[in-house]
Design a protein with these regions (language model features):
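Secretory-pathway lumenal glyco-enzymes, predominantly type II signal-anchor Golgi glycosyltransferases
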Residues: 2-464
Length: 464
């Protein structure tokens, strides 16, 4: 009897000890919310932080360390790599680092259960795996013998303290990325980890989800509008074109999204009787800075005359859902300087000269007050007519007038086929770009036509 009791007691001690050694508390984790300074995004980041703290309290545990990246003022923090040194220096005793966005939903207890399955002293990172079906422009047409796995950031991904320390060691040895352009932070970070982490590949975890279900530890929350006050009557669409594409592209735009635009102008190099709502602006074969600046000057007058709130600048091969664009704009104040689109970076590894900008092909939404500032302050005249317009006007110029561009993942610089299927499944896209090797009418019909039908009903009610 004594021996049986003794064996049971020893087993119990060993079992409890094992739990204590291998257990993972919320306080062992650092959660990094890759957020933005703009009010709407910052508010959602604060709500996520509050929710995580409440979950930790419900578990009767000390909470995770939670970082809102915008508060660190680290240049290019959205590309992740610039944050790593700070994280290791500040939270050297933490076991896991979990990165997410402000629209990520986190079920803390389930996340802890997942992380507990892996050893933090190993080079491991976990997430929801995405991969390219074929080489794509947004990933520099890179080809890999084995498909590169990269995480869906909106679902979140975790990195062990050991892997993070090894990455920082490589960075400090000078082995940091020196690519000029940052386009897709997730893909580029995965490439970096694979290169300097001795072949460490992302581990797929099904509970880190794209679409919510009861088993999910995390998943991205779909966008919800903040009101219903923005209508097509509040917006002016400026389409950049040239005579070369009047016949090939403009009819496509008019058949698809432009038929829902109450106020629209086509900015071209020559007059065209088939484009009565057109304006003549200087054209160049590259860069287009003078052309886009001329559009801003003309649009500023139109916005003032018609008392409009928003300017949308579009290429002549950009495809929109006007209805989804209107819903997005309900979350921003047009009386403050706001620029919204898809964010790219240029030489972000250079803390003195690197900057971010909104890429023009995806479409750019500018508040009327921002357009007025760009023109009236006189700080944004193009260095040359062929300077890249988006990099200068929606990057350097915004920096000069102290306006940070707002990134929305629903704007897309490329075609649907250039993105991972699961990535697009987690959102409702607003735009795609390029009429190259696609049928643009089909793209519009498949992605946007159904959403835009709601505008037909709205217009009928308005006319009544």
């Amino acid at each position: 009897m004594f021996s049986i009791y003794s064996m049971y007691f020893i087993f119990l001690i060993l079992f409890v000890d094992k739990i204590n050694v291998n257990g993972l508390d919320p306080s062992d984790i650092v959660i990094v919310i890759l957020d933005q300074k703009e009010g709407y995004h910052m508010a959602h980041a604060e709500m996520l932080k509050k929710n995580i703290l409440e979950q930790a309290e419900a578990l009767d545990k000390d909470p995770p360390k939670i970082i809102l990246s915008h508060k660190l003022n680290i240049n290019g923090s959205w590309t992740i790599i610039p944050l790593l040194n700070y994280l290791l220096d500040t939270y050297s005793t933490s076991k896991w680092f979990f990165f997410c966005l402000e629209n990520t939903v986190i079920r803390l207890n389930k996340l802890l259960s997942i992380l507990l399955k892996y050893k933090e002293n190993k080079n491991i990172w976990i997430g929801h795996v995405l991969y390219d079906q074929e080489p794509t422009i947004i990933h520099h047409f890179a080809e890999h013998k084995k498909k590169l796995k990269y995480p869906h950031i909106a679902s979140g991904f975790g990195i062990t303290s050991n892997l993070l320390a090894n990455l920082v060691h490589k960075i400090n040895e000078g082995d940091r990325p020196k690519d000029d352009f940052s386009i897709d932070a997730s893909y580029e970070f995965a490439s970096f980890v694979l290169k300097v982490g001795k072949g460490v590949r992302l581990t797929h975890v099904s509970e880190i989800c794209i679409i919510s279900n009861s088993e999910c530890a995390t998943y991205p929350r779909f966008f919800h509008p903040c009101g219903s006050s923005v209508t097509t009557e509040n917006i002016y669409f400026a389409v950049k074109t040239c005579s070369k594409f009047h016949i090939e592209r403009i009819p496509v735009i008019k058949r698809t999204w432009a038929k829902y635009a109450t106020n629209i102008g086509y900015f071209s190099d020559i007059a065209d009787k088939h484009l009565p709502d057109s304006f003549i602006v200087p054209n160049t074969t590259q860069g287009h800075c003078a052309k886009t600046y001329s559009i801003l000057v003309q649009a500023d007058k139109i916005l003032k005359k018609k008392n409009l709130n928003w300017l949308i600048i579009s290429d002549d091969d950009t495809i929109f859902s006007v209805a989804r664009l209107l819903r997005l704009l309900t979350c921003y104040n047009p009386n403050t300087p706001v620029a919204i689109g898809e964010r790219y970076g240029f030489q972000l590894w250079d803390s003195d000269y690197g900057y971010e900008y909104l890429t023009g092909g995806a479409g750019v939404a500018l508040s009327a007050s921002l357009v007025h500032e760009i023109i009236e302050l006189g700080k944004c005249e193009c260095p040359s007519s062929t300077t890249p317009d988006d990099m200068f006007l929606f990057g350097i110029c915004l920096s000069r007038i102290r306006v940070q561009p707002v990134h929305s993942s629903m704007f897309h610089q490329a075609r649907p086929s250039d993105y991972a299927t699961a990535y697009l499944a987690s959102q409702e896209p607003i735009s795609f770009h390029k009429f190259w090797m696609i049928e643009p009418q089909t793209v519009y019909d498949e992605w946007f036509a159904e959403a835009d039908k709601s505008l037909i009903t709205v217009r009928k009610h308005t006319e009544l």
